């Protein structure tokens, strides 16, 4: 049992920027999918062109590490920080080995909420029952959900890697990652349900008009109310 609350993604973003005094000028953050693009959009601070590299077009899960290699090749003078959720990491992680073969150093922060936390929250916000997004809600064998050690996996590909539990531990690990000359992976568990405020804007996600679930009908009423407040 943990003796501390799990951090949310926004708190991890803050820790990444605090881990280097010149982060707004020297870092390039790379991201693509899940909760992180929205959190980075609100929280990441950059004072130099190209310091914010997020694949918004299709939110391609798995783009992050491969994209980070390209960014580092284009900007070898900058510190490249790849921020990726556990879901995206599982979809395409082999480019860690490629980064080592090419001698392209990345700092990779894996935020492990044990599933697709962003989609889980959207599902709940639309009145749906938890289904197949978090590992705990998926079909499971007799041994339960997989206990994936992302740091051990990254080390098996040749990277330096470690697991941390708290924000202070994360900041210390990031200092070690920044000092390293090879790809370094830092993994931290995050809360799949907690996030920061939306930033003052409504995200329009349609809700079914007809449902037997009272939660869906309540979500539909809120959706229609928000639609009425939109500009014509």
What are these regions (language model features)?
Residues 1-49, 55-57, 93:
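Cofactor-pocket helix-loop regions in the catalytic cores of large enzyme subunits
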Residues 38-39, 43-232:
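Thiamine diphosphate
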